[in-house]
Design a protein with these regions (language model features):
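Active-site neighborhood of HAD-like aspartate-dependent phosphohydrolases
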Residues: 1-45
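An amphipathic alpha-helix signature
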Residues: 22-30, 65, 69, 127, ...
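Substrate-recognition element of Asp-dependent hydrolases with the DxDx(T/V) motif
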Residues: 82-101, 106-134
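A metal-dependent, Asp-based hydrolase signature
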Residues: 35, 48-94
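Juxtamembrane/interface motifs at transmembrane-helix termini
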Residues: 36-38, 64, 105-108
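Generic helix-packing signal
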Residues: 29-30, 75-76, 96, 134
Length: 134
């Protein structure tokens, strides 16, 4: 039997929290646009935009922000105020600035594995966003 020499990790929500920040931001987005559409419908429209845009923007915060802006324009009939677009950009900036907090035991586990294995990060996320987390 061959000895395992390399271990790959999917980082987001495996090594550190990630999805919870997207969900919290989505709640704030829904509140920003509450006057235009029911929260559940707005969430569904945002999800449609995210899926439609994956091939164009990929995974990550920047693609999420662009999908939120696109959704805001769509649900407002093009009348979304510039200040609301600014608020959406602010939500994205907050996500990008949020400190990375590893999940319990991750640091110790990686340090131990690094002594005997090559460790690699496997991600579908935005390169710049993922690199800032390392």
């Amino acid at each position: 039997m061959k000895h395992l020499t390399t271990i790959g990790f999917d980082a987001d929500d495996t090594l550190w929290q990630n999805e919870q920040f997207f969900r919290m931001t989505e709640e704030r987005f829904r509140a920003l646009l509450a006057g235009h559409m029911d929260a559940d419908q707005l969430g569904a429209r945002l999800l449609e935009a995210e899926k439609r845009n994956l091939g164009r923007y990929g995974f990550g915060i920047k693609g999420f922000m662009l999908s939120m802006i696109e959704t805001a324009i769509e649900v407002s009939g093009g009348d979304v105020p510039a200040s609301t677009i600014g608020d959406i950009l602010g939500l994205g900036r907050e996500m990008l600035a949020h400190p990375v907090e590893t999940l319990p035991g991750v640091r110790e586990t990686l340090e131990e594995l690094a002594d005997s294995h090559r460790l690699v990060l496997i991600t579908k996320g935005d390169l710049f966003d993922q690199e800032r987390k390392l």
